[in-house]
C-alpha cells in the first residue's frame, strides 16, 4: 500500500497532534489550574489515532478514501480551532477569534459524523 501525498500530510498532522498533546500535558502538569490546557491536550491525544485510522482505512480501501480524507480534515480543522482557542486563551488571555472553540467543536463532531459514514458506506470494489 502506497500513501498518496494528501494521506501523508494528514498522517503527519496526526503525528503533530500527538506531539502537541504530549507537550501540552507536560506543561499543564506544572501549571496550577491549567484545566483548559489539560482539555486541549486530551483532545489532541484522543483524535490523533482516529485521524491515523481514517487515513489507513481510506488508503487501504477499507473505506472510501474521499470520505476518510474529509473526516480526517474536519478533525484536524476542529483540533486547530478548538485546541488553538483554548491554548491562546490560557497563554495570551484572549480568544483566537470569536466563536473559535465552538466552531472547532462543531468541526470535530462533523468529522466524527463523516467517520461514521466511512463505516456505513461500502468501499468501492477494485475494477
What are these model-predicted stretches?
Residues 6-30:
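N-terminal signal-anchor transmembrane alpha helix
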Residues 16-24, 36-63, 73-84:
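Core segments of alpha-helical transmembrane spans in multipass integral membrane proteins
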Residues 1-2, 122-127:
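Short, charged juxtamembrane terminal tails flanking transmembrane helices
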Residues 27-31, 54, 61, 91-92, ...:
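Helix-loop junctions at the membrane-solvent interface of multi-pass transporters
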Residues 46-56, 107-118:
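Hydrophobic cores of alpha-helical transmembrane segments in multi-pass inner/ER membrane proteins
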Residues 35-42, 95-106:
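Non-cytosolic membrane-interface motifs at loop->transmembrane helix junctions
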Residues 10, 14-18, 71-78, 104, ...:
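Hydrophobic alpha-helical transmembrane segments of polytopic
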Residues 85-100, 118:
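Membrane-helix boundary connector in multi-pass membrane proteins
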Amino acid at each position: 500500500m502506497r500513501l498518496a501525498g494528501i494521506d501523508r500530510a494528514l498522517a503527519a498532522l496526526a503525528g503533530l497532534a500527538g506531539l502537541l498533546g504530549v507537550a501540552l500535558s507536560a506543561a499543564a502538569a506544572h501549571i496550577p489550574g491549567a484545566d483548559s490546557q489539560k482539555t486541549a491536550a486530551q483532545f489532541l491525544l484522543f483524535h490523533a489515532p482516529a485521524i491515523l485510522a481514517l487515513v489507513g482505512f481510506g488508503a487501504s480501501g477499507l473505506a472510501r478514501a474521499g470520505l476518510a480524507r474529509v473526516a480526517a480534515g474536519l478533525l484536524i480543522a476542529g483540533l486547530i480551532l478548538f485546541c488553538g482557542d483554548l491554548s491562546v486563551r490560557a497563554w495570551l488571555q484572549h480568544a483566537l477569534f470569536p466563536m473559535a472553540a465552538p466552531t472547532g467543536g462543531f468541526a470535530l463532531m462533523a468529522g466524527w459524523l463523516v467517520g461514521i459514514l466511512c463505516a456505513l458506506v461500502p468501499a468501492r470494489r477494485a475494477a
